[in-house]
Amino acid sequence: MLYAAGVEPDVFCGDADSVSPEVAAWAHASARTDIRFPSEKYATDLALAIDCARHEAARRGAQLQLTMTCASGGRPDHVLAVLGQLAASADAQARIVEDSYECRVLSPCGASSWMVGDEEGALGATLSAIALRPDTVISERGLKWELDHRRMELFGDLGISNVVVKPSAEVVCHEGVLAVFLVRQGASIS
């Protein structure tokens, strides 16, 4: 993605086993910092990248903020592992931005709310909220079905397929960790 956009990475971290040799060579040469790992290891590249980003944020005295794309590589098993990694790093204010949707991980120890009504094309869009920790408590305003300090079951379906109806729409995570998906209108997640 960075290669195609012509954006050079600050840090390259991983084994480069899921990109072409050309892109791997470019990433290794372009990054200011290049941290390589063997392809056979006991952690995913995402887990290593989060640790690397946490270290870099601490070195800079900055708060950890993660924005990702192509995070799952199109694999359903990776989707669940990605959400698990982001739940374990709830302070990271994580965002996954894809063509058809955006996902934010909310938690009181990181970004606790998302003003979804501020997003371009949000009005009328589908919004789903899924608890990534037991006993997650959320509020939703400006959606077709609103919730007020409602406790959610881990991976339960209470927050699935809501609709943004007001420009002031907001989702707040009071306790636990929450994945909030804003699905772009006309898009389907495959």
What are these regions (language model features)?
Residues 1-91:
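Acidic/Gly/His-enriched mid-domain segments of enzyme catalytic cores or analogous surface patches
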Residues 3, 7-9, 25-30, 47-53, ...:
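Low-complexity, flexible helical/coil segments
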Residues 14-16, 57, 88-92, 117-119, ...:
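Short, surface-exposed linear patches
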Residues 16, 38, 98-100, 133:
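Residues at the C-termini of beta-strands that transition into short coil/loop
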Residues 18, 36-39, 91-94, 121, ...:
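Glycine-rich loops and low-complexity Gly/Arg-rich segments
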Residues 69-71, 97, 130:
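Short beta-strand segments
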Residues 89-104:
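Short, acidic/small-residue loops that bind anionic groups at enzyme active sites
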Residues 99, 106-190:
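Long, charged alpha-helical interface segments
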